[in-house]
């Protein structure tokens, strides 16, 4: 089975079907942003389209008109790079829709791929709602889900979430090992995920955590008390075993009141000197350095699907216009 072929121009589309397609990163950086951009760019070039990378998100477009025509060599090594080579931030197009429309028209964009998480979804929604005021936004636009939180509406998988889980497994295993070495220590680990408990739930499952706190299942005094009683029972039965370290997982948005530090303090107070607690916050380390193999595979599939959607949308429009012209004639 061949996974590549010579660039012999056999896949080039007719000149009238070639498009200018913009690619932009929106939101927090995550693994596989670059891999998806590379896949979309290479697909576009193989078909004769012109891919434009919008640099530094919508703020870069609005302030500086930062668009760059992407070539083969520009994205050649992007498949294994984390972060965002184009640059990304949380700025939304609503900050200056007029400037966004101006640059879209200036570069004659005929399709847009927005890669990111919930902010990317929000940006797509804003552009769609502004179509009546800015006709250029009537082009086909897609949101390619890419966020460690895996919380983009209407999607089942987001790029970067698998890489995040792999990083957290190693992190939590190291934390639990430290807790075990101290025999009587509990770690409360705070993980990212926004308002989705996906990351916290999976990490709690694969690392053997005693409790997991997510936004979907709110923390209250009763549940916390039950978890502490379970913790006491576990320590009572361990009798100083060398694997007696314990761990709680808390999503960053699980509660505004019961913070990671507060939960750790409550556990320490309940221990009455029999066991102690610590907090561990991996922070932006969770975004990972290099995308996992799964994220890389999905990045290619998602990138190509986005391009195919834009192609099919424009083909449908051309066919409809052709029919109207023929009827008029």
Q: Can you name each region flagged by the protein language model?
A:
Residues 41-70, 125, 129-175:
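Glycine/threonine-rich beta-strand-loop-alpha-helix active-site module
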Residues 51, 103, 114-116, 122-131, ...:
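Accessory alpha-helical/coil subdomains and C-terminal extensions
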Residues 9-62:
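N-terminal phosphate-binding or glycine-rich loops at protein starts, especially the Walker A/P-loop
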Residues 1-14, 61-112, 119-121, 148, ...:
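Glycine-rich oxoanion-binding loops at beta->alpha junctions
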Residues 30-40, 61-62, 94-98, 118-126, ...:
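Short glycine/serine/threonine-rich phosphate/pyrophosphate-binding segments
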Residues 262-329:
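C-terminal non-catalytic interaction/assembly regions of soluble proteins
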Residues 26-28, 49, 54-59, 90-91, ...:
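Short, ordered loop/turn segments at secondary-structure junctions
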Residues 20-30, 84-87, 110-116, 187-190, ...:
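Short glycine-rich or small-residue beta-strand-to-loop segments that form or flank ligand, phosphate
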């Amino acid at each position: 089975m061949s996974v590549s072929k010579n660039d012999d121009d056999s896949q080039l589309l007719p000149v009238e079907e070639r498009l200018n397609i913009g690619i932009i990163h929106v939101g927090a950086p995550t693994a596989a942003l670059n891999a998806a951009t590379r896949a979309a760019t290479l697909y576009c070039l193989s078909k004769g389209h012109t891919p434009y990378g919008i640099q530094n998100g919508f703020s870069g477009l609005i302030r500086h008109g930062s668009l760059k025509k992407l070539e083969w060599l520009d994205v050649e090594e992007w498949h294994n790079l984390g972060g965002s080579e184009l640059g990304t931030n949380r700025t939304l197009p609503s900050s200056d829709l007029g400037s966004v429309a101006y640059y879209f028209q200036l570069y004659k964009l005929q399709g847009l791929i927005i890669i990111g998480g919930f902010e990317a979804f929000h940006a797509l929604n804003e552009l769609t709602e502004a179509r009546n005021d800015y006709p250029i936004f009537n082009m086909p636009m897609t949101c390619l889900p890419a966020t460690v939180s895996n919380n983009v509406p209407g999607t089942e998988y987001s790029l970067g979430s698998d890489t995040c889980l792999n990083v957290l497994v190693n992190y939590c295993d190291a934390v639990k090992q430290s807790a075990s070495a101290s025999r009587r220590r509990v770690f409360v680990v705070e993980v990212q995920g926004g308002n989705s408990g996906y990351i916290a739930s999976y990490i709690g499952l694969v690392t053997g955590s005693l409790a997991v706190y997510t936004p979907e299942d709110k923390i209250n005094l009763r549940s916390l008390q039950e978890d502490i009683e379970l913790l006491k029972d576990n320590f009572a039965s361990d009798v100083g075993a060398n694997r007696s370290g314990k761990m709680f997982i808390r999503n960053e948005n699980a509660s505004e009141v019961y913070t990671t530090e507060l939960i750790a303090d409550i556990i320490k107070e309940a221990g009455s000197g029999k066991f102690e607690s610590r907090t561990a916050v991996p922070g932006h380390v969770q975004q990972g350095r290099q995308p996992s193999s799964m994220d890389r595979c999905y990045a290619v599939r998602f990138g190509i699907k986005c391009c195919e959607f834009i192609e099919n949308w424009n083909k449908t429009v051309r066919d409809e216009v052709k029919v109207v012209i023929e009827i008029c004639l």
